[in-house]
Design a protein with these regions (language model features):
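Short aromatic/hydrophobic "clamp" motif used to bind/position activated sugar donors
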Residues: 90
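A conserved acidic beta->alpha catalytic loop
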Residues: 41-50
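Conserved nucleotide-sugar donor-binding catalytic segment
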Residues: 83, 143-215
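Conserved donor NDP-sugar-binding/catalytic core segment of glycosyltransferases
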Residues: 102-131
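Cell-envelope/extracellular polymer assembly enzymes that use nucleotide-activated donors
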Residues: 5-8, 36, 183
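Short, well-formed alpha-helical segments that are part of the catalytic scaffolds
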Residues: 16-29
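Glycine-rich, basic loop-to-helix element that forms the pyrophosphate-binding segment
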Residues: 67-85
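Conserved short acidic donor-positioning loop in nucleotide-sugar-dependent glycosyltransferases
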Residues: 27, 42-43, 68-69
C-alpha cells in the first residue's frame, strides 16, 4: 500500500519568476500532503531565488538545494536533485505548469503494480486557456523504446516513479539529445514496469520559452537521425554496463 508514503517532488528552476508561484501553490494545495518539494536553481538572474526563499520559510516541506556547482543545465540540474532525493517515490515538476489538486493522490493509486507511471495532461497557452484537451493525443503517447526514441512521449511533469529505478538510471549521459525524462522512460521500459494512465492531471502551459518541448519538427532530417543514433549508442552502452554489473 502507498498510503501516506513520502514523495520527493523535484523542481529545477531557471529564470522562472513569471509562473513559479502558481506552480508551487498548486503543489501546496495537493490533497495528498506527504511530500517534500526539492528545488535547485540553476543561476537565475530574475527573482526566482527570492520567491523560492519565501516559500521555503512558509512551508517546511519546501527545501532549496544550495551548492557551489553553478549552472548545470536542465538535465544535470534534475540529476543533482535525483541524487539529493531520499524518498521511496519521486516526481518531476516544471516551474511553469499547474497541477490539479488531486494529481498526487490519483497517481499514487496506480503505482503499486508499476515502477513508473505517466499521466495525461491538458495543454494550455500562457494564460491557462485551453489549446488541446489531451497531451496524449498530440504526441501519440504510448509504451515502447523504439517508438519513444523516434518521438519522445515521456514527459517528466507527468511522471511518478519508484526510487529503485535510479540504480540503473543514474548517472544520466551528458548529451544534449538526452533529456532527463527521456532517459528515465527508456531505462524503465527496459528493466521495469511502465504504465501510461488515462488521467489528465495537470495543465501543461505552453509559452514562448518552452514551445519546443512538444514540437521539434523544424530540425532537419539529418539532425534527427544523428540525434537518434546518439540516443541508441548511449542506451547500448548503459545496457552493457548494467549487464556487466548485474548479469541481466
Amino acid at each position: 500500500m502507498t498510503e501516506n508514503k513520502k514523495i520527493d517532488i523535484l523542481m529545477a528552476t531557471y529564470n522562472g519568476e513569471k509562473y513559479l508561484s502558481e506552480q508551487i501553490e498548486s503543489i501546496i494545495s495537493q490533497t495528498y500532503t506527504e511530500w517534500n518539494l526539492l528545488v535547485r536553481d540553476d543561476g537565475s538572474s530574475d527573482n526566482t531565488c527570492v520567491i523560492l526563499t519565501e516559500y521555503e520559510k512558509k512551508d517546511s516541506r519546501i527545501k532549496v538545494i544550495k551548492d557551489n556547482k553553478g549552472n548545470l543545465g536542465i538535465v544535470k540540474n534534475f540529476e543533482e536533485l535525483l541524487y539529493n532525493s531520499n524518498s521511496e517515490f519521486i516526481m518531476f515538476t516544471d516551474q511553469d505548469d499547474v497541477w490539479k489538486k488531486d494529481k498526487i493522490e490519483i497517481m499514487m493509486r496506480y503505482i503499486d503494480d508499476s515502477d513508473l507511471i505517466i499521466s495525461d495532461a491538458i495543454i494550455t497557452n500562457e494564460n491557462l486557456e485551453l489549446q488541446y484537451e489531451s497531451l496524449y493525443s498530440v504526441v501519440n503517447s504510448r509504451n515502447g523504446i523504439v517508438k519513444n526514441i523516434i518521438k519522445n512521449t515521456y514527459y517528466g511533469c507527468c511522471m511518478l516513479f519508484k526510487k529503485i529505478i535510479l540504480d540503473k538510471v543514474l548517472p544520466i549521459p551528458e548529451n544534449k539529445e538526452i533529456g532527463h525524462d527521456l532517459w528515465v522512460g527508456l531505462i524503465s521500459e527496459k528493466y521495469y514496469k511502465v504504465k501510461f494512465i488515462n488521467e489528465k492531471l495537470l495543465y501543461f502551459r505552453r509559452h514562448s520559452s518552452n514551445m519546443t518541448t512538444i514540437n521539434k519538427s523544424k530540425r532537419s532530417i539529418k539532425a534527427k537521425i544523428i540525434g537518434r543514433y546518439i540516443i541508441l549508442k548511449e542506451l547500448a552502452k548503459r545496457f552493457r554496463e548494467i549487464k556487466k554489473r548485474t548479469n541481466y
